[in-house]
Curated annotation (Swiss-Prot):
Organism: Schizosaccharomyces pombe (strain 972 / ATCC 24843) (Fission yeast)
Modified residues (N6-(pyridoxal phosphate)lysine): K256
Gene it is expressed from: eca39
Cofactor(s) listed in the protein's UniProt record: pyridoxal 5'-phosphate
Function per UniProt: Catalyzes the first reaction in the catabolism of the essential branched chain amino acids leucine, isoleucine, and valine.
Transit peptide start and end: 1-47
Chief localization: mitochondrion
Protein name, UniProt field: Branched-chain-amino-acid aminotransferase, mitochondrial
UniProt catalytic activity: L-leucine + 2-oxoglutarate = 4-methyl-2-oxopentanoate + L-glutamate; L-isoleucine + 2-oxoglutarate = (S)-3-methyl-2-oxopentanoate + L-glutamate; L-valine + 2-oxoglutarate = 3-methyl-2-oxobutanoate + L-glutamate
Family, similarity comment: Belongs to the class-IV pyridoxal-phosphate-dependent aminotransferase family.
């Protein structure tokens, strides 16, 4: 599997990308300059990469991975008995970084505990980010990753925000692909089941003080998981946030930081006491819809202009750029827009959703994320009034939600084998 294939799989060529030389190593960040696109893959860039590799700190490199196999493989669990995040594969992957030396050789080692100094920066100042992605087994037995380059890009973006070291996302995606190939037997062979992959990026300086990290670690663990809904879709009720906000302008809501998740647990617990599965996070005097729980939110309605529309909040700095979100938008533009649907990334408020419900224009609402793929919503409590979302009789999801779910699942499980979003993870 070539790195160029992974780049194509993530549509990198269509993005604004810049490689920069940072302290003798190659860094990566998104820029708006059109000229940056034309710079990618040029002779000049290749020369810079080679120079950095020879004379500066070592860049992340997927070409060689050191493997130390466990002495005895664990028995595989019964797939039907799986609980999310409780079973782990035989091995994990570790890469260390030092400002002087650069990236260490990636190592696949037996799964086990990690040991850190009590003053490590990850424990005190929040130098931590993570990703969530999955591998699926197709009908021919081939394990497949879903758009791994997108997760690698997002991890770089998040890590950069908290001053963790740079890397080439294509190298990380390829390293993860090789790790999944090594743990191949842990990828379930039933539709609805998958191998959940958790890359984690942390600062490991052994000293107190808030400053950029001189040492870091990126490690990957994996856990086989069952379907989010064991017996098909299960629509949920939401409760709008009134006292808490998930993110705010100028903050870090659009980064996958661990610190964005812990503060949501207490409000979520209070909502659960009232019988609601998730919180619909709102922002501002207009009660703009941002996210639902830990997922992006989509609304399907007839808008005020009488158009059939699928709308989700824009990436304005408060919204996590979800891989599932991006995939849904792309597939809807490709397959539903030609059928008269308007696909929109734009601000819209809970006030507008409530009004649409009163006028019979509200059709469907669903959350979207890696864990559930899509999570249909059947009711939203807003300022003490519960607004019901219509459902087909005897079903737990509307037709658009169901169709989107099937389209993406078919890609994930290799039903569309030539789709660039599906990356084989063979040894």
């Amino acid at each position: 599997m070539s790195l160029m294939f992974l780049r194509r799989a993530g549509n990198i060529k269509g993005r604004n990308i810049r490689f920069a030389l940072q302290r003798g190593s190659v860094g990566y960040s998104q820029q708006s300059s059109e000229a940056c696109k034309n710079f990618l893959n040029t002779t000049q860039l290749r020369t810079m990469v080679q120079t950095a590799a020879l004379h500066g700190p070592k860049p992340m490199d997927s070409s060689h991975i050191k493997v130390t196999n466990v002495k005895e493989l664990k028995p595989l669990p019964e797939w039907k008995s799986l609980k999310f995040g409780e079973n782990f594969t035989d091995h994990m992957l570790i890469m260390k970084w030092n400002r002087e030396k650069g990236w260490s050789t990636p190592e696949i080692v037996p799964f086990g505990k990690l040991c850190f100094h009590p003053a490590s920066s990850v424990f005190h100042y929040g130098f931590e980010c993570f990703e969530g992605m999955k591998a699926f087994r197709d009908e021919k037995g081939v394990p497949r990753l879903f758009r791994p380059i997108k997760n690698a890009e997002r991890m770089l973006s998040t890590g950069t925000r908290i001053s963790l070291p740079s890397f080439d996302p294509a190298e990380l995606a390829e390293i993860i692909r090789k790790f999944v190939a090594h743990e191949n037997r842990w990828v379930p062979d039933q539709r609805g089941y998958s191998l959940y992959i958790r890359p984690t990026f942390i600062g490991t300086d052994e000293a107190l003080g808030v400053h950029h990290c001189d040492n870091a670690m990126l490690y990957v663990i994996a856990s086989p998981v069952g379907p989010y809904y064991s017996s098909g879709f299960k629509a949920v009720k939401l409760c709008c946030s009134e006292e808490s906000v998930r993110a705010w302008p100028g903050g870090t809501g659009h980064y996958k930081l661990g610190g964005n998740y812990a503060p949501s647990v207490l409000p979520q617990k209070e909502a659960a006491k009232k019988g609601y599965a998730q919180i619909l996070w709102l922002y501002g005097d207009e009660d703009y819809i941002t996210e639902v729980g830990t997922m992006n939110c989509f609304t399907v309605w007839i808008n005020k202009n009488g158009e059939k529309e699928i709308i989700t909040a824009p990436l304005d700095g408060m919204i996590l750029p979800g891989v599932t979100r991006d995939s849904i938008l792309e597939i809807c533009r490709e397959r539903l827009a030609p059928k008269g649907w308007k696909i929109t990334e734009g601000k819209y408020s809970m006030k507008e959703v409530a009004q649409a419900s009163k006028e019979g224009r509200l059709l469907e609402v669903f959350g979207a994320g890696t864990a559930a793929l899509v999570s249909p919503v059947k009711a939203i409590n807003y300022k003490g009034t519960e607004y019901e979302i219509p459902m087909p009789e005897g079903q737990e999801a509307g037709p658009i939600t169901s169709e989107i779910s099937k389209w993406i699942l078919d890609i994930q499980y290799g039903k569309e084998p030539n789709n660039p979003w599906s990356v084989p993870a063979l040894p």
